[in-house]
UniProtKB/Swiss-Prot annotation:
Enzyme superclass (EC): hydrolase
Cofactor (UniProt): Mn(2+)
Protein name per UniProt: Serine/threonine-protein phosphatase BSL2
PANTHER family: SERINE/THREONINE-PROTEIN PHOSPHATASE BSL3, SERINE_THREONINE-PROTEIN PHOSPHATASE BSL2-RELATED
Organism in which the protein naturally occurs: Arabidopsis thaliana (Mouse-ear cress)
Tissue-wise expression: Expressed throughout the plant, with a higher level in younger parts.
Active-site residue list: H787 (proton donor)
Gene from which the chain derives: BSL2
Amino acid sequence: MDEDSSMVADNDQDREFQSLDGGQSPSPMERETPQQMNDQSPPPEGGSVPTPPPSDPNPATSQQQAAAVVGQEQQPALVVGPRCAPTYSVVDAMMDKKEDGPGPRCGHTLTAVPAVGDEGTPGYIGPRLVLFGGATALEGNSGGTGTPTSAGSAGIRLAGATADVHCYDVLSNKWTRLTPFGEPPTPRAAHVATAVGTMVVIQGGIGPAGLSAEDLHVLDLTQQRPRWHRVVVQGPGPGPRYGHVMALVGQRYLMAIGGNDGKRPLADVWALDTAAKPYEWRKLEPEGEGPPPCMYATASARSDGLLLLCGGRDANSVPLASAYGLAKHRDGRWEWAIAPGVSPSSRYQHAAVFVNARLHVSGGALGGGRMVEDSSSVAVLDTAAGVWCDTKSVVTSPRTGRYSADAAGGDASVELTRRCRHAAAAVGDLIFIYGGLRGGVLLDDLLVAEDLAAAETTYAASHAAAAAATNSPPGRLPGRYGFSDERNRELSESAADGAVVLGSPVAPPVNGDMHTDISPENALLPGTRRTNKGVEYLVEASAAEAEAISATLAAAKARQVNGEVELPDRDCGAEATPSGKPTFSLIKPDSMGSMSVTPAGIRLHHRAVVVAAETGGALGGMVRQLSIDQFENEGRRVSYGTPESATAARKLLDRQMSINSVPKKVIAHLLKPRGWKPPVRRQFFLDCNEIADLCDSAERIFASEPTVLQLKAPIKIFGDLHGQFGDLMRLFDEYGSPSTAGDISYIDYLFLGDYVDRGQHSLETISLLLALKVEYQHNVHLIRGNHEAADINALFGFRIECIERMGERDGIWVWHRINRLFNWLPLAASIEKKIICMHGGIGRSINHVEQIENIQRPITMEAGSIVLMDLLWSDPTENDSVEGLRPNARGPGLVTFGPDRVMEFCNNNDLQLIVRAHECVMDGFERFAQGHLITLFSATNYCGTANNAGAILVLGRDLVVVPKLIHPLPPALSSPETSPERHIEDTWMQELNANRPATPTRGRPQNSNDRGGSLAWM
């Protein structure tokens, strides 16, 4: 049948499926009335929809059109506090034929899918928006675009619900209708969809036959020709429902919440762990105050694992204005928290999507034929600042403007977003909206807005947040979102048991940068803005490194396939299996229960030692001890991504960067912690014969050592140096040097690799370290990094430096000789059998230390296994909320590993701490996995652009770990022409202030990427 005659207007009650909501026996439903389902009243006079300004149809500008169309009204301006909600404009998208476009519809979904492959390579597919399902017709108006025959009887025809798929290519600005292989889902509307990698997961909804089954349908878009799959899920699940929400949390958990099961609105929470097979739904009972039973809300997940549920309509058909955050504790508990800030309006049947830390909310209905309009039709919840903004200002009280029944006129930009039952998705900094319903008229327009604040979370925003939340009611989180885990605070206060003590960063941030790094993981998407060229250069350089190692990785994988390498039962994140279906490699959450690590012995000292960066003046050489909780930037790793054009990296020059080089002569010439100056002449002071002698002596020592060194405390641990010999000398000067006049007689030295490349003085660095190894072979220890490989350091500066400073013939010979020595370097070090030190990480393949011990040396990267690749190349995931294995943004085939892998490894090997290097971190050190892993980086201002601090770890006999830091030096006052080390353009992101800002007080909120002991949600 075409209509459900039982559905009649009933004041403000939405009985869209009366036989379902009313508890009567279900029967097929085929339409909804706008008064009931959509709460719409008649369209504007004449039945027309305001015509948006035309866009440039020129295909040549299609890639920039979406950003340009919003840029006209959003000129750069001085921002004091959070930016207001952006303005939307119409995109004039192209299509080859009419049916390629989705046409008018509502109740559909729009899902952003990241790019596949590398741009410029065969098979590359750019970022896309995938539109599925929805209702395409209204009762009394089959076309859905004109004036209905009667405003009161115009309803949504569920007989017109579809299961078609349309794809919008963001780069080409073009719609295409897809015809995937496989069995599609049944036609439906009011369903949910979310992306899992390059797959779109569909669930629930309602169609011509009533409620859709609870099956999970997956549209795999990895290949050129998409394919539908049905996911087999065991046990009971959410059951059939519509008007619910679903999101992927922490890149792992599919969360389904609320909706209507045909009888009543719901408030239940279901989770499906995509890493655990067989798949099964688990009903959660989160702690804290959660949302009431409701439907037509929105849910969007932030990249760090926070799910935000916003708005909706409760069991009494009352629209909601509240927002709730849901996050997972490290012990497996889930908890709700009410989001701070004042929402500008209640709403339901709206759309919401995160762009970094900002939740963009658009449109929505209020009931009684009213829709959200005026400046509140578009709103932003800035989760970094803890405030709501509409298109005009920060919201301090609910808006009380008019909510007329579809009144025409007014601001055209506001009119564009005055709609409900539409869908939204984000690609980079761009927010797209498609379709929906306004005044009984189905819409078919594609809107776009640019979030100019995507990379901004300013100091002023933090102050605005604090001011806005001064009078927050009980149960709300004041100021910035932050959920403090009291158990970890107690742990910090009871450190006498010897546990690893974790603190929260609070110290003067480098560069005065107060913003929380909440960049999304999927850096592959275009439009992601970075605040400086330096970070872009580091991203490009890291991608080039991955490109350089790709052949080696492919060879290692080939050996694995041929049976030469046996891997444990794990896979590589979302890599494709032979069947073409992406798999997941995260560990079951209940396995964490068996991963307990006895917190005895090792602990992180509650204070770190910091040296002022100034070389003179009142602060010159001043040493301070700061609380370990005072490092604002500890959670900020220099992000990696895949830039649009990653080419072979060139040598980076920085007049601050240096490195070392044979025994007593080398030590006498180079070990000058306070007096070393970069040589005026670049000619290296050793000849190739002397370097050969040094390498021969050191190589004999390395060959006699085990692959995993067995060391004792006390010991100093150094991270990446990358040819920055000046930083090595500064660390020796401030915290003791390896000489008889220094502290070598009572403390050992351990270096974690990456001695060469990037900096100007790789020869000095490696020469001095080798000389120290020969002179103090039982006290100075070196292990291998990923740059101690010929195929890498041929591209990133070391080979060029050898030729430049020793001539082509001798330079190439020396480069080959030192790389042969690198093949003998040990690969890890165990300290007191409680700490394991390595360069990269444990990746996907390393479960036991014995796997590392069994690697035979000498070994080249080309001949190495996946174990060697993981050991030298893998990284931790973005933060503690991202568990299991994920693809590594450094490049294809490389992985990141989550805190569950760290805990499992420590438990398997009776270890308490992993110390690794490999990644630039802003404070020189960074904690992960509740403090069971520390990333260490000793070179400051990495690549001349990162402006990061450098650090070492000092482990005492009492097994207390003390971080000791140095900050980047300010640029030299001498001119580039007269300076021995020529000034290079864009060396610094910005100059450091002559006087650093005052140290913030203890106890300030942690940033959202905290790797310490508390759970910072927002």
